[in-house]
Amino acid sequence: MTTKKWAKSAKPVARLPKKAPAEPKPVAAVAGESKLRAGLEGSIERVVLHEWTIASLDPRLPAVLSTPHMIGLMEIAAAQAILAELPPGAISVGTRIEVDHLKAVPVGSTVRARARLVEHGGRFLVFDVEASSGVHVIGRGRVFRAIVEPRKFQANAHSRTS
C-alpha cells in the first residue's frame, strides 16, 4: 500500500523519444572522400619541462613526466598521423585511451611519442601509440579518435555549459 501511495505522488518520468536520433553522417560523406588508410604514422619529440611533471602540481611528488602529459604527446602524434589525409575542414578529437605508463623520466629528458593508425571505420579511428626516452619505452597503448567538423563540435560542447 505504501508503495502505491508513493508511486501516485511521484512526479511523472520524462518519456524517451520513440525513435533514436539519426546517426550523424561521417565527415568523409559530407566533405569529400577521406584518404585514411591503416599504417599512417605520426610522431612528436619534446624535452620534458618542469610544468609537465607531477611535482608542478604537488611539490611533495617527484619531478618526473606526468601520465597526462605523456598521453597528450601520444594524442598529438595520433592527430598528426592523419592530419594531411583528413577531408577539408575536418579535425580529429580524442574519444578514449588505453595506455600504460611504464617508466618515469625526469625534467630535461627527450621524449618521443609515435602513433600508427591501425583501424578506421567511418569517422572512428584506432591508433597504436608508444612513448620513449632514449632506448627506453616509457609508455604504450591505444588511442581512439573521431573525425569531426570543428564548428559543430564546438557548438555541441558549448551547449553543455550551464
Model-flagged regions — what are they?
Residues A79-R112:
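Hydrophobic beta-strand-centered segment that forms part of the acyl-chain substrate-binding groove
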Residues G72-I76, Q80:
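Short, residue-level hotspots on alpha-helical faces of the histone-fold
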Residues V30-S66:
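Catalytic strand-loop segment that frames the active site of acyl-thioester-processing enzymes
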